[in-house]
Amino acid sequence: KLKSRKYSIVHINSPDKRGIDVALLYKTKYFSLLTTKSVNVIDTSDLEFKTRNLLVVTGILSNDTITFIINHWPSRRGGGKDEKRIVAANTARSVVDSLLKKNMNAKIILMGDFNDNPKDPSISKHLNAQPEKKLNDMALFNAMYNIHKKGYGTLSYQGIWNLFDQMILSKGLIDNKNEKYFYQKESASIFYKKWLINQEGQYTGAPFRAFSGSEYIGGY
């Protein structure tokens, strides 16, 4: 079924010690690839630290140029420190700044698993992703902020919902009615189906995971 849909991927091996990579899946019918770049996340105070790279992909979407920055920031597993995610945030911010320096109206979408919530300093301060749509030129808009504020998320831990999976947009995609693509207010959402949620047992109401530790349990 997927083969007939004509999907393609952008993938570059990352330095991550667990072998986890980031990738972009896209339909060739709608998106024409122009450039691909891998940006390593380097902690200068801990050069032995290895994590996922940032995948920077630019292409044409319906005659408009758009850049995707694909993220999978350092994990919280085993008490993973927020300083590592701040390093990732600063790295992503430097990529954004370099794009905006060339074109202040550049259309940029940062997406992926940030392993932090919208209010956490890595996102709100270091990446400068804000909830308000009244943005200065360099700020980004976090389309998922209000969703998390309402108590929704994509990860349940000890009964509390976290929203690590986020979509963050540059000003070039906000309220630009003269362009074909712009963000429509409150259009961001979390895909929800009953079969994605545990219906019984200890984790009733939490997402049905693919793995429990190293054991595959058949979820998503």
What is each model feature region?
Residues 49, 98-107, 116-220:
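Metal-dependent phosphoester-hydrolase catalytic domains
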Residues 73, 113-114:
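Active-site metal-binding loops of divalent metal-dependent hydrolases
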Residues 1, 16, 48-49, 79-90, ...:
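Soluble non-cytosolic domains of exported or imported proteins
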Residues 22, 86-89, 93-96, 123-124, ...:
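Extracytoplasmic/secreted envelope proteins and their assembly/folding machinery
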Residues 62-94:
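Metal-dependent phosphoester/phosphodiester hydrolase catalytic core
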Residues 2-65, 73:
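Structured beta-strand-rich core segments of catalytic domains in phosphoester-bond hydrolases
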Residues 30-32, 59-67, 94-106:
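Secondary-structure boundary elements
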